[in-house]
Amino acid sequence: GMGSSSSFTVGLLHNVLAQLGRADEATKAHLAEMACRVELEDLGEPIGKQDQYAAAYGGLNVFRFLPDGTVQADPLDLGTEGRAELESHLVLYYTGDQRSASSILAEQSKRTATEQDKQRVLDQMVDLVDPLASALRNGRWSEMGNLLHENWQLKQSLASGITNPNLQSLYATALANGATGGKLLGAGGGGFLLFACPPSQQSRLTQALGSIRRFPFSLETDGSKVLYADSENG
């Protein structure tokens, strides 16, 4: 649910280009495009393009996936203070549940391709993007939580394996103990739950969700980067 496979692919490709002395080719857009080609075309994974672009670009961005297959990346710069404020209003928990992202996404892909009402749900999810970007830019954290909640309600209808009774119970507990909204990250079925929650309510929330572990995190601002390259190999 944290985009680990796509992050690995982007990082591996970045490293290969650096070792070949072709680091100048490792633009954010090119790394993302190559990673998409490897995962979607070469490996045939039934996934989207969001994770690859998020890993390559880093930071907060609005990605627009256009009909011609191109991707437009619009940075969402909150500044140092705004980013810190955003981080302080988000809490991340690991549910302990394991799931196959590919199997859930395969079902989701099949169902969205064969059922017209699924396209309506996807359109509604897309319609939440600009309001969420506006809420982030203007520090409207309660609205951010409400939009995350609305997105999660829509996402659950896309495939049967996205949620389960345990996840539903955890989510309901969170809403009853300070969270204004949230969502399960990734394909669904398990992994990490992200909640919007005022800092003053986070201790209460964590205590209520005592059966799962809270994970501290910070937002990555730079995307993929090579930390060390052997000069003898470029």
Question: Would you name each region that the model predicts?
Answer:
Residues 2-23:
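DPxDG-like acidic metal-binding loop motif
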Residues 19-20, 33-46, 52-182, 194-234:
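C-terminal nucleotide
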Residues 27-32:
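Short, charged, amphipathic alpha-helices and their helix-cap/turn boundaries
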Residues 190:
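Glycine-rich active-site/cofactor-binding loop and its immediate structural neighborhood
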